A protein has these predicted regions:
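Fe-S-dependent hydro-lyases/dehydratases of central metabolism
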Residues: 1-260
Length: 260
């Protein structure tokens, strides 16, 4: 947060999204901010654990059920009686609490991108690849059951503002070269820990030649370099995708020229 007399500085996309969610005019890398979450996604991998903890609370309460999206996608159809029981627990809880629920409609992140994610949002997902939402200019990050439960009950959480690694893309992919090749090449250069707790930001004229499928693939894999999140500038391709799916952006951010 900005204190009295502190000079303002340019902000990255990640910093701007966190500042918006925290109700602050400015944040910088390393700050810890209390944020209001825009959306909370969970799948059948761990939701039953979250429900179990929720039921042990003295006064259980969901802050905003409209922000919750639960998706059964990891084991369809269920592969054991134990899995079937955990999915039933998830299904029954979602119905009882009027939580948006999907089953057998696709991988959770694809379902989120097609139906819910909009630019400028801060989203927690109980899955490591929640960073995929950066393809639409949203700050998505994976959390565990305890952090998810806290956000579900309070509507808030804390976030340490990540530093940013910016990748300016040029040209376009050659025939036979795909988005997955591009991001794996980048990760190969920076290393599996090369973006630990960083935001990997993608921009440049080369971005415009990438389809939404390309962008989702790139952002999805950024966690393999340890990234806290991945973010792309919102352009005509992203806006056309939103329009096609009947949604409007919450906020479209770009990094300031003097951001560090």
């Amino acid at each position: 947060a900005v204190t009295a007399g502190e000079a303002k500085h340019g902000m990255t996309i990640a910093e701007k999204i966190i500042a918006r969610a925290a109700g602050l005019s400015q944040v910088k890398a390393g700050d810890i901010a209390t944020v209001t979450l825009d959306r909370l996604m969970s799948n059948d991998g761990t939701t039953h654990l979250t429900i179990g903890m929720y039921e042990k609370l003295k006064n259980p309460h969901i802050a905003d059920k409209d922000k919750l999206v639960w998706i059964v996608d990891h084991n369809i159809p269920s592969d054991s009686p134990k899995t079937a029981a955990s999915q039933k627990k998830m299904r029954d809880f979602a119905k009882a609490n009027d939580i948006k629920f999907y089953e057998g409609e696709g991988v959770c992140h694809q379902v989120m991108m097609e139906n819910h994610v909009v630019p400028g949002e801060l989203i927690f997902g109980a899955d490591s690849r929640t960073c995929a939402y950066g393809a639409l200019g949203a700050f998505g990050t994976g959390v565990g059951c305890t952090d998810y439960l806290y956000a579900m009950v309070t509507g808030t959480s804390w976030v340490m503002v990540p530093g940013t690694l910016r990748f300016n893309l040029k040209g376009k992919l050659n025939d036979g070269v795909y988005a997955r090749d591009l991001i794996l090449s980048i990760i190969g250069k920076i290393g599996a820990n090369g973006a630990n707790y960083k935001a990997m930001e993608f921009a440049g004229e080369g971005l415009h030649s990438l389809s939404m499928a390309d962008r989702i693939s790139i952002c999805n894999l950024c966690v393999e370099a340890g990234a806290k999140t991945a973010l792309m500038e919102v352009d005509d391709v992203a806006m056309d995708y939103l329009k096609e799916h009947g949604r409007e952006p919450k906020a479209c951010f770009t990094s300031d020229d003097d951001a560090v």
